């Protein structure tokens, strides 16, 4: 049965992957990728930040499987270049672009005090992945200073001085829409383990790009910044008691040396752990900055059926959390427990990275079973699913990171999978 679903999914993804590509239109001067097929209820016309990055991971696998290297390069590179075209002088990059405009909530630019979220830190990662695949950085070389401004904007305007951790400005367009560690929380109060894991890899990716063009001093500087961030994550986000990484609460009142109250013993901590069991707690394994001992403890947590381990993958929120909720929703999409292709894939990649092949195989097979059953029954895939019975919950026709099961299938069959940076 599993082999039949593998073949079914391979054929479907290889045939339909080109439906995620779009030609230049309006303000988008370059070809680009979108999350859904034409005509899908959502996401069929817009270029999104981490969605386009994940689409490129899939398209690399399609090109490898069909022996057509570079087939989608113009769309993948164009996605990066479109974002760079719309980067302002301060390095602020939009989260989303359409031919007619972009998704905004408040002003993320200097005029707004850099107080809104911007493109997630996957821009250098996207470029580094495509550069490695192409064997040349010539396509991105002129834009490297722009990527540098983008990263510097994160470091200058989105990082907490006391901890060295990146934080969400608001809960707007954070990717994991209603993650309770950020959703409806005060502005600039959450040092997200998800955001910091992405930023750690972003700094490493930019270092790789700089090395590729021969700028070794700056490459070393960016890698040192990545190491500093990893130290901050291990210091402030790791919980030795629970054996996992959590996001941190930064919303502490400042110490006032002029106020006599508490002067004898003011607080000496810079943050408090937000002990909310969320799938993104496993992202430090994907990022490769967890120690071997930390990874082993997290592996045990990923195996626990009371919390994360479900019949069809990793619950996006532990079943023991009071916020656990499997109802269908859009704006926000629901990350309060449903299984997503993206979370299954990134947890799988973390398990592979630390040599936990049996656990990785089990998660990959669950994902094949989830998507194979849906494709066989409905002729399409959906955005997210019930973790225990595998029933689709929302958005028929969603493609994007669901197609990452193709990369899992390659790994299951002992082929070298296409991977992210």
List the model feature ranges, each with a label.
Residues 183-190, 197, 254-308, 334, ...:
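Aromatic (Trp/Tyr) and acidic
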Residues 2-15, 71, 78-92, 131-193, ...:
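Active-site acid/base region of carbohydrate-active enzymes
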Residues 37-38, 123, 144, 182, ...:
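Short hydrophobic/aromatic segments of transmembrane alpha-helices and their interfaces
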């Amino acid at each position: 049965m599993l082999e039949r679903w593998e073949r079914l999914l391979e054929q479907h993804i290889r045939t339909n992957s080109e439906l995620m590509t779009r030609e230049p239109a309006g303000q988008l001067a370059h070809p680009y990728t979108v999350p859904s097929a034409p005509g899908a209820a959502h996401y069929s016309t817009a270029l999104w930040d981490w969605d386009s990055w994940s689409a490129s991971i899939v398209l690399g696998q399609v090109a490898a499987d069909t022996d057509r290297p570079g087939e989608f390069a113009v769309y993948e590179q164009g996605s990066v270049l479109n974002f760079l075209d719309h980067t302002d002088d301060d390095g602020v990059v939009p989260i989303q672009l359409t031919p007619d405009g972009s998704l905004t909530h408040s002003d993320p630019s200097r005029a707004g005090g850099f107080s809104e979220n911007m493109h997630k830190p996957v821009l250098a990662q996207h470029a580094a992945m495509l550069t490695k695949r192409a064997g040349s950085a010539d396509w991105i070389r002129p834009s490297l200073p722009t990527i540098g401004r983008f990263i510097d904007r994160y470091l200058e305007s989105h990082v907490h001085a006391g901890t060295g951790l990146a934080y969400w400005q608001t809960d707007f367009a954070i990717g994991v829409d209603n993650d309770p560690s950020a959703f409806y929380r005060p502005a600039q109060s959450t040092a997200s383990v998800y955001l910091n894991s992405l930023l750690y890899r972003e700094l490493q990716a930019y270092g790789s790009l700089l090395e590729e063009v021969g700028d070794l001093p700056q490459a070393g500087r960016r890698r040192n910044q990545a190491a500093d961030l990893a130290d901050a994550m291990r210091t402030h986000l790791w919980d030795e008691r629970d054996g996992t990484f959590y996001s941190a609460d930064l919303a502490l009142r400042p110490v006032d040396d002029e106020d006599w109250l508490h002067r004898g013993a003011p607080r000496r901590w810079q943050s408090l752990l937000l002990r909310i069991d969320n799938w993104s707690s496993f992202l430090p394994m994907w990022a490769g900055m967890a120690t071997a001992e930390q990874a082993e403890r997290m592996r045990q947590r990923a195996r626990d059926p009371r919390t994360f381990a479900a019949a069809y993958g990793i619950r996006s929120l532990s079943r023991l959390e009071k916020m656990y909720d499997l109802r269908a929703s859009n704006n926000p999409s629901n990350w309060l427990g449903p299984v997503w292709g993206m979370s299954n894939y990134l947890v799988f990649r973390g398990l592979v990275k630390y040599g936990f092949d049996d656990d990785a195989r089990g998660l990959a097979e669950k994902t094949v079973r989830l998507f194979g059953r849906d494709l066989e029954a409905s002729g399409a895939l959906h955005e997210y699913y019930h973790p225990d019975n595998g029933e689709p919950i929302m958005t028929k026709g969603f493609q994007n990171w669901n197609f990452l099961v193709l990369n899992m299938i390659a790994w299951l069959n002992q082929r070298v999978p296409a991977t992210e940076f």
